[in-house]
């Protein structure tokens, strides 16, 4: 047996003596339940039943209510004792009506003597039966596996403090010695010392004197040995990442959050120096709403500066797919909550687990009272390149700058010496960045720091071989290491994560619905604001609650699609309810209102039960509206025949194009009559399907070699001409695989250069990816993409590993590939993933992942996108405006607009301010231009939190700038 094995064996013997006394509680009773809402449960049994040691307990993905009564032995009254229960579930424990704390797989005991008076103890336990994320659990299909467990009993126990202290010492030293990060000589010294110390203990007749002798030996021979010098400075911030939905529903996160908060509060009771950072205003809101007594306790710790709200946002959203205004509202509603409840403006954005960060974020943060940005995955999860900085300055699309921290190791650690050293070793800004940040605490399902982590932290200073550590708050770490630091490097660009690229496409219905609701909310707020002049009351609370619900569903494991089936159903139910309320707010009328702040020039589909076109299951007609910006107008279905188009088999002539189709609907030639050029080079409008088996992170990832495994799509019904009216001509083709059917309706227009593709899909695949590919006859080395608040240009060559890693990127309403003189745009209604190489771009349409949701994306789909060849580049062709027209329908409502003309600035939002004093107007420069807009009256200049910071009657804007104005009521 090797020396370290002999040490570990005796260490196991020692841990058996942590409890000097254990008294079993034999009166446990249980009844099972299913959680149906945040605080409501469906009980499976009318009465409690006995729960004995050795019984199986908990139902799949279920809740259990457990109770017990116990009379404390007389000799323990007034002494320190604890409640001991080992479980794989997540438990919230009340004793004599007091919340004593939480028990879960990461901790098995609660100190009770400070929370329970007298000898009579009444236990009330609520437990949720969790499963590890890697067990491929689906609550509806797995009825047993990974869900039930054996009850190991509950005890009133007394901790032998001498043994426990020695256990912490050895735990820390073994980790340091066996990890190899501190060197062989140090490891050998520790192994010799531990062996000698444990030799002082008679394990057949263990006594406290032997334990104290072993501890003294370790102090004098290992901790006192300063021959081994460490280097570096590491800031330790206690934290727990809490997914508000993931492998559990949102309703379960209420108790996950409470358990986490309770655990950290109880650690603060025991350790006066302990501090903890907790994100997401929404999680504080749920404590306030459902557990007001704990919220009052929480507020006291916040006032002390020990329980620290971090992350200025309402939830930790995905930062790729939500549009600019959604991210602004995350800050507005998050900061508003922290200000109202705690008197704090949180100066940092804390998003450790998001899947990359849009280039538009720095400006949003800077104008929302946020100076610092913390994320993590780029430094720890990239699959190709090592992100070059950890502490740096992040420059946004408009030139705004925020301090940024991307710690070099994972945001979930258990605070071991080896993890601290690994963090320092991986830290890339040692000379410029000051301390490196290490978060410690269990996460994903909450839980946070443990007693062991705090005890180890207190011992770190004894190990001279370790970096210098400081337990601090998140905000103090950021202020200390960033403010005034002129040595920091600058990263100018998006924070692209070289992983999880599939989340741009997975659960495509969620993404399309989110897009639709974002624009519905914009229009509902705009129209409600305009109606104030007519004496109508602005529905502030209703709109705020809808926005909050939308923001919750933009959480980074909901909107990206990385969750179980019930989470998807909850989100879709929310979306349907939000849509219904927004329709009511938008209202109806005799005329159509153009909510865009520019004249509509593009083709539009008008729902009409008498129409002769069926689009996405709704009758209607296409027309080219002539309605000015923010104005009303009438629209008629102009009757006429299709004499504007000539069809000869698969050859088609329109006013704009000469087109040659293939039988499968792909375009062999697209000759532009106006520009006298061919647009096709290679496969164009070609559906391509690939095997999509990324491994462990099924819903998250797409592998770079997916093109190596194509799948056959057969032609079931070749292209046929359906017919034409005065404005639109339709063609249909049906494709199929062994399991799925795919109808493509191709629409050509008399008065539009756009070519619309409607897809009607019966999707029943597993591990497949479908893209629509467009090989364009343009010489371009970049793909221009919409970010929702400006444009980003991405290289389409593969010269470096950085470009090779970006084989799939996120865009918003459109992407464009152009050369001098013309290009081709792809405009979508809710598809975010796109790839581009050379002169070929491919829009990702559907995936078919099975983990964590085996039913992901299965069923019927109906979606549209548009090919738009154009003269000039994307800016001169006004592709952004065309994309807005494609995404924002005309609203049938009667209202008059009194807003001024804002020139070429996009009218992003119009709303009543949160305090009711202003009409808030948010404008965004989308094309990279400078300019001036003169206002007819003076307006307040606001930040994104709606604080007044100035006054102006003239807007001098710069590229990609977001401007917020307040017009007084």
Regions found by a protein language model. Name each.
Residues 1-76, 683, 690-721:
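Extended carbohydrate-recognition surfaces in non-catalytic/accessory domains of CAZymes
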Residues 1-39, 150-248, 518-629, 633, ...:
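Histidine-centered catalytic/metal-binding microenvironments
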Residues 173-203, 241, 245-247, 399-589, ...:
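Catalytic grooves of carbohydrate-active enzymes
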Residues 77-95, 123, 593-595:
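Aromatic-lined ligand-binding clefts that engage carbohydrates, nucleic acids, or primary amines
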Residues 361-366, 376-380, 388-391, 424-425, ...:
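C-terminal (or distal) subdomains of carbohydrate-active enzymes
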Residues 319-340, 408-428, 708:
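Alpha-helical scaffold elements lining the catalytic groove of polysaccharide deacetylases
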Residues 218-236, 255-271, 286-345, 359-367, ...:
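Catalytic alpha-helical scaffold of carbohydrate-active enzymes acting on polysaccharides/glycoconjugates
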Residues 92-139:
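Beta-strand-rich ligand-recognition modules
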């Amino acid at each position: 047996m090797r020396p370290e094995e002999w040490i570990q064996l005796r260490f196991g013997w020692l841990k058996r003596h942590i409890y000097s006394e254990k008294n079993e509680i034999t009166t446990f009773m249980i009844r099972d339940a299913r959680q149906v809402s945040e605080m409501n449960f469906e009980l499976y049994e009318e009465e409690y039943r006995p729960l004995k040691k050795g019984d199986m307990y908990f139902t799949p993905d279920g809740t259990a209510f457990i109770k017990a009564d116990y009379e404390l032995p007389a000799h323990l009254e007034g002494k320190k004792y604890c409640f001991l229960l080992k479980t794989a579930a997540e438990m919230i424990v009340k004793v004599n009506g007091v919340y004593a704390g939480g028990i879960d797989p990461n901790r098995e005991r609660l100190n009770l003597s400070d929370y329970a008076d007298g000898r009579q103890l009444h236990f009330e336990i609520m437990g949720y039966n969790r499963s590890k994320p890697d067990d491929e659990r689906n609550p509806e299909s797995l009825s047993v596996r990974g869900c039930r467990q054996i009850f190991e009993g509950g005890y009133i126990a007394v901790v032998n403090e001498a043994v426990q202290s020695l256990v912490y010492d050895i735990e820390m030293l073994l980790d340091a010695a066996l990890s190899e990060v501190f060197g062989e000589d140090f490891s050998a010294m520790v192994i010799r010392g531990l062996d000698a110390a444990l030799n002082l203990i008679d394990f057949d007749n263990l006594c406290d004197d032997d334990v104290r002798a072993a501890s003294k030996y370790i102090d004098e021979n290992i901790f006192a040995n300063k021959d081994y010098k460490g280097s570096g400075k590491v800031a330790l911030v206690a934290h727990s990442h809490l997914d508000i939905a993931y492998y559990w529903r949102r309703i379960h996160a209420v108790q996950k959050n409470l358990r986490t908060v309770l655990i950290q509060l109880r650690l603060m009771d025991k350790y006066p120096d302990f501090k903890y950072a907790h994100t997401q205003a929404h999680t504080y809101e749920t404590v306030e709403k459902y557990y007001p007594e704990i919220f009052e306790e929480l507020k006291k710790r916040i006032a002390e500066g020990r329980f620290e709200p971090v992350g200025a946002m309402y939830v930790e959203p995905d930062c790729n797919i939500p549009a600019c205004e959604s991210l602004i509202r995350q800050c507005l509603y998050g900061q508003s909550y922290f200000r109202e409840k705690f008197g704090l403006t949180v100066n940092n954005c804390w998003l450790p687990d998001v899947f990359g960060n849009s280039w538009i974020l720095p400006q949003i943060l800077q104008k929302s009272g946020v100076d610092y940005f913390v994320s993590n995955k780029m430094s720890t999860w990239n699959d190709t390149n090592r992100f070059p900085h950890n502490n740096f300055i992040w420059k946004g699309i408009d030139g705004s700058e925020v301090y940024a921290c991307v710690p070099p190791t994972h945001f979930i650690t258990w605070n071991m010496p080896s993890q601290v050293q690994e963090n320092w070793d991986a830290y890339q800004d040692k000379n410029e960045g000051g301390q490196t940040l290490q978060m410690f605490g269990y996460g994903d399902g909450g839980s946070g720091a443990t007693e062991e982590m705090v005890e180890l932290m207190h011992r770190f200073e004894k190990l001279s071989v370790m970096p210098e550590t400081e337990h601090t708050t998140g905000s103090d770490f950021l202020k200390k290491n960033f403010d005034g630091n002129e040595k920091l490097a600058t990263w100018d660009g998006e924070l692209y994560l070289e992983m999880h690229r599939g989340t741009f496409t997975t659960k495509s219905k969620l993404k399309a619905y989110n897009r639709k609701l974002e624009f519905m909310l914009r229009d509902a707020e705009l129209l409600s604001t305009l109606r104030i002049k007519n004496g109508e009351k602005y529905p502030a609370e209703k709109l705020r609650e809808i926005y909050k619900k939308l923001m919750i569903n933009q959480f980074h494991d909901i909107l990206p699609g990385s969750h179980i089936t019930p989470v998807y159903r909850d989100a879709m139910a929310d979306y349907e309810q939000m849509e219904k309320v927004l329709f009511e707010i938008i209202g109806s009328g005799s005329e159509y209102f153009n909510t865009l702040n520019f004249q509509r020039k593009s083709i539009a589909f008008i729902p009409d039960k008498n129409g002769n076109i069926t689009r996405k299951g709704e009758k209607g007609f296409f027309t080219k509206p002539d309605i000015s910006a923010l104005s009303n107008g009438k629209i008629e279905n102009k009757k006429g025949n299709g004499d504007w188009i000539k069809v000869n088999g698969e050859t088609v002539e329109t006013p704009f194009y000469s087109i040659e189709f293939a039988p499968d609907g792909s375009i062999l030639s697209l000759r532009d009559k106006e520009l006298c050029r061919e647009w096709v080079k290679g496969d164009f409008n070609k559906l391509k399907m690939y095997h999509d088996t990324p491994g462990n992170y099924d819903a998250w990832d797409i592998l770079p070699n997916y093109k190596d495994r194509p799948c056959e799509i057969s032609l079931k019904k070749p292209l046929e001409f359906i017919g034409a009216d005065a404005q639109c001509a339709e063609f249909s083709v049906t494709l199929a695989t062994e399991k799925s059917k795919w109808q493509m309706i191709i629409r050509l227009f008399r008065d539009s250069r756009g070519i619309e593709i409607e897809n009607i899909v019966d999707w029943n695949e597993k591990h497949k990816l479908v893209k629509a590919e467009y090989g364009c006859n343009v010489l371009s080395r970049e793909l221009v993409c919409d970010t929702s608040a400006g444009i980003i240009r991405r290289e389409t060559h593969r010269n470096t590993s950085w470009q090779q890693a970006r084989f799939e990127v996120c865009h918003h309403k459109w992407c464009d590939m152009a050369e001098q003189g013309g290009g081709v745009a792809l405009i979508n209604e809710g598809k975010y993933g796109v790839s581009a190489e050379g002169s070929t771009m491919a829009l990702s349409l559907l995936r078919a992942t099975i983990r964590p949701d085996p039913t992901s994306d299965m069923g019927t789909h109906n979606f549209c996108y548009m090919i738009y060849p154009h003269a000039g580049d994307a800016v001169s062709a006004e592709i952004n405006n065309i994309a807005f027209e494609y995404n924002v329908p005309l609203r049938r409502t009667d209202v008059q607009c009194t807003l001024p003309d804002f020139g070429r600035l996009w009218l992003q939002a119009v709303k009543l301010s949160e305090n009711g004093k202003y009409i808030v107007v948010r404008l965004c420069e989308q094309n990279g231009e400078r300019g001036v807009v003169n206002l007819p009256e003076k307006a307040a200049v606001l930040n994104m939190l709606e604080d007044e910071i100035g006054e102006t009657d003239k807007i001098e804007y710069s590229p990609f700038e977001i401007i917020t104005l307040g017009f007084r009521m």
